[in-house]
């Protein structure tokens, strides 16, 4: 499983 989170 892979999780990508990005907030800018």
UniProtKB/Swiss-Prot annotation:
The keyword Secreted applies. Its main location: secreted. One of its GO terms (cellular component) is extracellular region. It comes from the Bacteria. It is found in: Secreted. Disulfide bonds: none annotated. Keywords: Antibiotic, Antimicrobial, Bacteriocin, Secreted. One of its GO terms (biological process) is defense response to bacterium. Narrow spectrum bacteriocin, active against closely related bacterial species. This is Bacteriocin.
């Amino acid at each position: 499983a892979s999780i990508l989170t990005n907030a800018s």
